[in-house]
Amino acid sequence: MKKPKLSKVEKIDKIDLFSSLWKQRSVRVIMAIGFLYLVIVSVEIPLVFKSWSSSSVPLDALSRLEKLNNEQEPQVEIIPNPPLEPVSYPVSNPTIVTRTDLVQNKVREHHRGVLSSLRFDSETFDPSSKDGSVELHKSAKEAWQLGRKLWKELESGRLEKLVEKPEKNKPDSCPHSVSLTGSEFMNRENKLMELPCGLTLGSHITLVGRPRKAHPKEGDWSKLVSQFVIELQGLKTVEGEDPPRILHFNPRLKGDWSKKPVIEQNSCYRMQWGPAQRCEGWKSRDDEETVDSHVKCEKWIRDDDNYSEGSRARWWLNRLIGRRKRVKVEWPFPFVEEKLFVLTLSAGLEGYHINVDGKHVTSFPYRTGFTLEDATGLTVNGDIDVHSVFVASLPTSHPSFAPQRHLELSKRWQAPVVPDGPVEIFIGILSAGNHFSERMAVRKSWMQHVLITSAKVVARFFVALHGRKEVNVELKKEAEYFGDIVLVPYMDSYDLVVLKTVAICEHGALAFSAKYIMKCDDDTFVKLGAVINEVKKVPEGRSLYIGNMNYYHKPLRGGKWAVTYEEWPEEDYPPYANGPGYVLSSDIARFIVDKFERHKLRLFKMEDVSVGMWVEHFKNTTNPVDYRHSLRFCQFGCVENYYTAHYQSPRQMICLWDKLLRQNKPECCNMR
């Protein structure tokens, strides 16, 4: 049924009604609110769905997360902690808290500077008869005075003008060959022949010598010895230290513990020997790696071999009558007392090869960390008379040995900007002024870890001033460019390394409010993720001391590293972690700095023992300490699944980092 149509008058009445309602203000407000509500709802609904969909984690992301958690070195996300309060100190000693806060504010203002803000004054090194460190305090005071004077010269710029290098563009001559007579060589200091530009592929050394007759060892006629050592040394690799032994060749004519003639070969870097290669008269196994297709060890006739004059006669007879059967020739030990020999050492593609009297004796593969151009010195020592030395096929171009030239001035290696606020771990790296290549290797290896590049962990080199002015000028430039060096203003000395450790504690605990302080050396490779995981094992808030611990060690009273009773009157050392790598909690670091600046910190020349002593004092007077021991903080060299690896050359540092990136597991670079 159709609805009746409205008349024209009725339509006009409805329009008038709507118009009158619209003119009412309340109706207009209600309609505006309704329209706004519709707009908000239409916008919110897609966002809700999007948020819901993004909260659903896909399976592949979960699997990646699970894989990361199962890895030995997860990329730990470190959330910045609130400013650390010195809660570990007794409440009854409020002066420490107040003073620490003041010092912390002072240090934070200057922590981006080059110079350490550790406070030295005239009373810092006053000798104290209480702890037997009179001589150490005297030398520290002298070093501080010299360093302060030198730093003022550096700051003023006068030193840079005084240091001139007239021969900067004049390279050393690179002769194609070098030769010396026996008398010339034997009269040289340390029996050393310099090879100005090192060796190159194909270089060879020919030495004519005569082993001396065996003599009693230390006057004991039951122990006769006759041995000599030929070494290739890296004279320009380090300064002020024993040069690395790139090749150590040591024939022992009377043998050693085996009582059989033996040839031992090895390499040594910073007093750390690698795995020895011993040739004892047995030919290398067929499945053993060769060096340029040569075996590492050739066979020679031993005393227990069945090789008589009759067998030699039969061999010659068979040769004369034309027997087709091939008879293998065997030779005696290549060196005989009081008999001349001609030794040739040649540099191959994969290693060094040694021939004696025209016969191959042994080959030694190149070790990671050294190159041919590093071999700039030849030494011969021991029970031998040298008749002549001839070195040929030397490089004619001059390689760069200046350590500072190893610096790669690229912004890629500069320290990242550290935001305000505390960091999780501060790593202080002990370094010497002239260790330019060592610092560069650290920058290009483990300091590229994501935790350091993201500034969640901060690493800095701590360097004292060097005895050579030109080194200090270059060092200051390096510090200003890379922004990762803290100069401690005293003249560097091995006995005063402990001052750098105090500076590390001060810089880490006060300048960066770090929760933990780690100390290591510039030849230490740090597997950062593994160290962090080890720290996380200690309950939150506990004072900790982590490293390769030594218990009940006694001081050496004789020899090169002797410790006098005046220096250390006690019979035992306290428990201490080996110096190449250890971790302290920040409350211990603050304790050390406070004692030092109040002139109450006992100093000892052995840095790692000093830290153990300070930690024990903290434990006895302030808070319990959680000691954690692990052999993976390596004192000597590198071990499987290391946390830190020590005595690593710059090339080994790069090798360790490359292996860690490619294989995601710690693998040593002891070999080539």
Swiss-Prot record:
Single Gene Ontology MF annotation: carbohydrate binding
Glycosylation sites: N306, N620
GO cellular component terms attached to this protein's record: endosome; Golgi apparatus; Golgi membrane; trans-Golgi network
Record topology, Lumenal segments: 50-672
Protein induction: By salt stress.
Membrane topology: Single-pass type II membrane protein
Compartmental location: Golgi apparatus membrane
Name of the protein described by the UniProt record: Hydroxyproline O-galactosyltransferase GALT5
Source organism: Arabidopsis thaliana (Mouse-ear cress)
